[in-house]
């Protein structure tokens, strides 16, 4: 198993975001996390990625307990949060090289060049992130989630702001990625799940 959640609950004050949820993801599976806004999708993803530690229940990633091995687990997860935290004053390549340093990626220039090509960022490569369209900012977010070649990819609303052509390209990229990695993506759009997930 790649990802296992058992009896996971999370509250924000008196508001329950998650109430005793559980699921399992197999290696090489693309799974859609479907639900309306406010259903707890982002909270679940923040827990899986180690961004939220204040929860009840158990989370195991690649047979490691998240509470006992948070740094090892973070190293094997690529995460695109719903609010893509980019640095608007950095150039695309500069930002991605920064991410490779955080993950201690070997051959960073080669990895960045490959992910720029894979995510279709070449046409905008000379721009700062703050100058990019919403769709290209999403691509940069996806590139940063993939640049360290993670085993598990967590994508929170990855299709937000994409035009129809970009949607098709990103769907294809996620499907290709899912052949070798475990992918969990959240959305509130059923067609996205049908188009991408196993």
Where does each model-flagged region fall?
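ABC transporter nucleotide-binding domains
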Residues: 3, 10-198
